[in-house]
């Protein structure tokens, strides 16, 4: 049992990031999607530590924030951002019957480029105004983004018979897949409540649940189902919208 969980986590790290793992470590890609939030926790830890190091190096806050956003993209190989771009191109097509075809096109259209600029800009600006505890929020928000992805996998049908995202739906175990991410979020939010602020902890819980549900639900309404691209879009937009929500009233 423990070996199976370990092999799934290894596969999730290889699939969702560019982080290297020893070749001798076993992998099992079936069922890996439930570990996406834990991968988000690993990425969040790298981002939070990097942010602190940049602060020690006295990098200006706007530059520091942009570098963190770019590092997040680099660590995933742009996987989720690419999905958000393809989704934007597809949604821009008036004819619903052609949306999946456009999303499958390897060429980036104008709306895809606009979506990428919007996501990077929103995240960077929001990070400049992110309240305390900044490091814990940077740590946990990537977990929320990927938990939202798992929620969409569990709740909604997959629109393609094949594709890079099909394995998520085909090998999922249902609502139980939400558990690893939920545990990570409960522990993280509990830490914020215990060591910093109950108010901030409750805000993170409420805002996270709102956008984790809303992004997938909105795409479901627009497309009638999900694809690998929409999973990426859910991750990116959930993160961006949570960060933006936390900046309201900070000026």
UniProtKB/Swiss-Prot annotation:
Membrane-related topology note: Multi-pass membrane protein
InterPro entries the UniProt entry points to: CobS
Pathway: Cofactor biosynthesis; adenosylcobalamin biosynthesis; adenosylcobalamin from cob(II)yrinate a,c-diamide: step 7/7
Catalytic activity: alpha-ribazole + adenosylcob(III)inamide-GDP = adenosylcob(III)alamin + GMP + H(+); alpha-ribazole 5'-phosphate + adenosylcob(III)inamide-GDP = adenosylcob(III)alamin 5'-phosphate + GMP + H(+)
GO cellular component: plasma membrane
Keyword Ion transport applies: no
Domain of life where this protein originates: Bacteria
Keyword Transmembrane: yes
Cofactor(s) in the UniProt record: Mg(2+)
GO molecular function: adenosylcobinamide-GDP ribazoletransferase activity; cobalamin 5'-phosphate synthase activity
Subcellular location: Cell inner membrane
Coiled coil: none
Alphabetic keyword roster: Cell inner membrane, Cell membrane, Cobalamin biosynthesis, Magnesium, Membrane, Transferase, Transmembrane, Transmembrane helix
Enzyme Commission (EC) number: 2.7.8.26
Gene Ontology biological process terms, A to Z: cobalamin biosynthetic process
Transmembrane segments: 29-49, 65-85, 110-130, 136-156, 175-195, 198-218
Family: Belongs to the CobS family.
The protein's role, per its UniProt record: Joins adenosylcobinamide-GDP and alpha-ribazole to generate adenosylcobalamin (Ado-cobalamin). Also synthesizes adenosylcobalamin 5'-phosphate from adenosylcobinamide-GDP and alpha-ribazole 5'-phosphate.
Protein name, UniProt field: Adenosylcobinamide-GDP ribazoletransferase
